[in-house]
């Protein structure tokens, strides 16, 4: 089944300390956002991309889309005050495919086969998210003193893209908007209205580039991909 994608690129990325939006940082000779968009650009099941940007950077994004010949970005939408508001703005710009994938622009390493697994699961269950099992020991703390060691056997680290039936994620966002609720991700809004969210086993290499150290990991992942 086909799908539309919302790609979020409006964040400030302060933790990267790059002096610019991290989406414009180069990774292997291409801007980060271009690498991310190309995953969807090259997937035949993706019919359309909505790119959510800071309005002050709109022209720069438009120049990148033209320079790198990215054809599937059909709309550039302004970001909101919070990530959730940015997603909501992106949802308003969709054309109406039954399934939508919502993705962080700073995750350039998602695999196409994972996109398809997520789409198939969203068709069946309504909502699906990629996640990886937590490897480290997790402790709950009060200040800098341990209160409890958490059983990690049921813990998952959640990634994007997150996939939804459009009608379901619209319902979830509208309910959150009316209640003034801010969730930590889009799936949490679906959970809030009592609907199931299916986990699809993700890939540890599908990292989100957040800090300068992540750029080093990203270069290593890119080198390994090029060697495949």
Curated annotation (Swiss-Prot):
Annotated pathway: Isoprenoid biosynthesis; isopentenyl diphosphate biosynthesis via DXP pathway; isopentenyl diphosphate from 1-deoxy-D-xylulose 5-phosphate: step 2/6
GO biological process, one term: isopentenyl diphosphate biosynthetic process, methylerythritol 4-phosphate pathway
Record key words, sorted: Isoprene biosynthesis, Nucleotidyltransferase, Transferase
The EC number(s) this enzyme carries: 2.7.7.60
Site (Positions MEP for the nucleophilic attack) location in chain: 152, 208
UniProt key word NADP: no
Chain segments annotated as coiled-coil in the UniProt record: none
GO MF annotation terms: 2-C-methyl-D-erythritol 4-phosphate cytidylyltransferase activity
Catalytic function, reaction form: 2-C-methyl-D-erythritol 4-phosphate + CTP + H(+) = 4-CDP-2-C-methyl-D-erythritol + diphosphate
Enzyme class: transferase
Cross-referenced Gene3D superfamilies: Spore Coat Polysaccharide Biosynthesis Protein SpsA, Chain A
Site label Transition state stabilizer, positions: 15, 22
HAMAP family, per database record: IspD (MF_00108)
Similarity section: Belongs to the IspD/TarI cytidylyltransferase family. IspD subfamily.
Cited function: Catalyzes the formation of 4-diphosphocytidyl-2-C-methyl-D-erythritol from CTP and 2-C-methyl-D-erythritol 4-phosphate (MEP).
Cross-referenced NCBIfam families: ispD
UniProt name for this protein: 2-C-methyl-D-erythritol 4-phosphate cytidylyltransferase
Organism from which the protein derives: Geobacillus kaustophilus (strain HTA426)
Gene from which the chain derives: ispD
């Amino acid at each position: 089944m086909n799908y539309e994608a919302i790609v979020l690129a409006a964040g400030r990325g302060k933790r990267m300390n790059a002096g610019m939006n991290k989406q414009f940082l180069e990774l292997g000779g291409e801007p980060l956002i271009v690498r991310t968009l190309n995953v969807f650009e090259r997937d035949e099941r993706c019919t359309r991309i909505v790119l959510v940007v800071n309005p002050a950077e709109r022209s720069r994004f438009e120049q990148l889309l033209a320079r790198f010949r990215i054809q599937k970005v059909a709309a550039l939408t302004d970001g909101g005050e919070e990530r959730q508001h940015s997603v909501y703005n992106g949802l308003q710009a969709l054309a109406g495919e039954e399934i939508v994938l919502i993705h962080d622009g700073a995750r350039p390493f998602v695999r196409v086969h994972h996109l398809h697994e997520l789409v198939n699961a969203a068709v069946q269950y309504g909502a699906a998210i990629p996640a990886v099992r937590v490897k480290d020991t997790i402790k709950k703390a009060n200040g800098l003193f341990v209160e409890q060691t958490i059983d990690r056997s049921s813990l998952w680290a959640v990634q994007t893209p997150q996939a939804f039936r459009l009608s379901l994620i619209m319902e979830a966002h509208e309910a959150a908007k009316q209640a003034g609720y801010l969730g930590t991700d889009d799936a949490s809004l679906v959970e809030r209205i009592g609907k199931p969210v299916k986990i699809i086993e993700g890939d540890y290499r599908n990292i989100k580039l957040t800090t300068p150290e992540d750029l080093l990991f990203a270069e290593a992942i890119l080198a390994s991909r090029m060697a495949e």
